[in-house]
């Protein structure tokens, strides 16, 4: 057994033990971290002349300018990495240990420093739970433990690169979730079925069902809380179809079954099927580069058609 493989297996076993202590929570990998940060950028980065200023600070996890916009961005990230729980209005310090132990072979984070960081977070008490309240509560800890928290939460590029190299199961940068999932569902013998899937044919094959389940999870249509229709509605809005929300929710609520392929089939057999294809394609395109919208790109039907033709050509 190679040293790298042994390390990965040891980490996996340790994570399993820790997960049993902290419910069912798993440490977040680099792909998950990138998604969380990019989504918080999308939802909080302002338009206008100061957009670049905010982006230049936030990308380095420098919580400036000190205003409501930055406060809400910080709260978004803290909730996203599940260090802060908005429902209970409490910080989850135990998860720092789980995150650290899972990747410390790659991060090199000091155990004592991480323990101090965890202790500091455990002592935090939140009041109203507003953006400013959460921000001001966490800020002193952020300033004191900026560097170690960056390591623990895989925000250092060199650390993420090591993990990508060691773990082939993490989706790569520049790879769409459709491509990532297809590699795990189909092989050369079932390539024809994969091509049909690119054309939105409902073949009902086990491979297609596995691929759709994988994609739905990658697109966050299914998350740790189960099926997430809000995420699908969001994708319709991003192709400039907000008026379809009632229809989309109606289709999903009436869909028999609770599996990804069943929801996928319901949408493709509904009166919103063509718009769903566009929304699904646009999500695939954005999954290649999580900063797609942050960079100022918008839905462009002609460009999307061109990019999907390229993706189809790789399979068909």
From Swiss-Prot:
Record localization: Secreted
Protein purpose: Modulates blood feeding of female mosquitoes on vertebrate species by binding and sequestering different mediators involved in the host response, such as biogenic amines and eicosanoids. Binds serotonin, tryptamine, histamine, leukotriene C4, leukotriene D4 and leukotriene E4. Does not bind octopamine, dopamine, noradrenaline, adrenaline and prostaglandin PGF2alpha.
Origin superkingdom: Eukaryota
Protein name (database record): Long form salivary protein D7L1
Signal sequence residues: 1-23
UniProt keyword terms in alphabetical order: Disulfide bond, Secreted, Signal
UniProt-recorded Gene Ontology molecular function terms: odorant binding
Any GO BP: sensory perception of smell
Entry keyword Iron-sulfur: no
Gene expressing this chain: D7L1
Any one cellular-component term (Gene Ontology): extracellular space
Family (UniProt): Belongs to the PBP/GOBP family.
Native species: Anopheles atroparvus (European mosquito)
